[in-house]
Amino acid sequence: MNLVTIERHILEQQKFFPEASGELTDLLTDVAFAAKLVRREVVRAGLVDILGFAGTTNVQGEEVKKLDLFANEKIINAIGQHGRFAVMGSEENDGIIIPPKNETGNYALLFDPLDGSSNIDVNVSVGTIFSIYRLKGDDPGKASISDCLQQGSEQVAAGYVIYGSSVVMVYTTGNGVHGFTYDPTIGEFLLSHENIVTPKTGKYYSINEGSYAQFNEGTKKYLDYIKEEDPATGRPYSTRYIGSLVADFHRNLLTGGVFVYPPTTTHTNGKLRLMYEANPLAFICEQAGGRATDGRNRILDIQPTALHQRTPLYIGSEDDVIVAEEFEQGVR
């Protein structure tokens, strides 16, 4: 059996980019290392008193879990000390983070340290999501928020890590999507899903139907449609939703389906974060042959105006996303 580690695979991907300096390779390797640190604590969370709430709220106004803070700290410290990133942004921090030695970095990192952390106390899969951009300017010492507020189409790499029954890291550099499973016996991520291609249509839909009363008429009609009996179109679809975006997305990426987080009367602009969740997953989804929009516009074309900007999200198999969009737009 030919065992390919994530570090080796990242190095091999460099040949597709003749102009590559190797710096991005080091960045992705740093992210993989940080994921190992977070994974170590996630699997021990119930034993070392890092479950439950920390007693604070983040910039989103949400109660912060202890493990959120731990994961955030580990990622910042593990990645920010090497001088490869000039600026960073985290879902858990109000503003940008300027790491030590940033004057040598040429990239910006945006990340959600622990997506789905509300599930950690009940042992449901959680994950880390990340996104990498090249700096807009030539002077890393002057890196600013503008280097973070780039359209998703400017990403040079994106990925996520799922901490579940196994630990899986998925990433893209714009040349396909590849997945790696962590082998704890050797401490390495090994290639397990090469060149992931998501089905054009699926059989699952993922949405929080507990918010049905807050949905607009388009979303309600879509839900009625998706549940109707029609063998010709593969309906009804089955519901799969556990409230952990990265886990729901990963399942649909592999099996086919659509994840929908529409606007509601409570969150008229959507709830998910454009920079930390929607953009990186949209980049991955499109690279795997899928589609990602806010119901009307391509996610990767949205010009961000704030670090913690929110957005609706329709993401997954291309045909399924198009159908959901048509209901959102009132075409159906």
UniProtKB/Swiss-Prot annotation:
Family per similarity comment: Belongs to the FBPase class 1 family.
GO cellular component: cytosol
Cofactor note: Binds 2 magnesium ions per subunit.
Pathway this chain belongs to: Carbohydrate biosynthesis; Calvin cycle
Protein's recorded name: Fructose-1,6-bisphosphatase class 1
Primary location group: cytoplasm
InterPro entries to which the protein is assigned, alphabetical: FBPase_C_dom, FBPase_class-1, FBPase_N, FBPtase
Residues bound to Mg(2+) 2: D112, D115, E277
Keyword Metal-binding: yes
GO BP, one annotated term: gluconeogenesis
UniProt catalytic activity: beta-D-fructose 1,6-bisphosphate + H2O = beta-D-fructose 6-phosphate + phosphate
Cofactor: Mg(2+)
Subcellular location: Cytoplasm
Residues annotated to bind Mg(2+) 1: E91, D112, L114
EC number(s) stated in the UniProt entry for this protein: 3.1.3.11
Assembly and binders: Homotetramer.
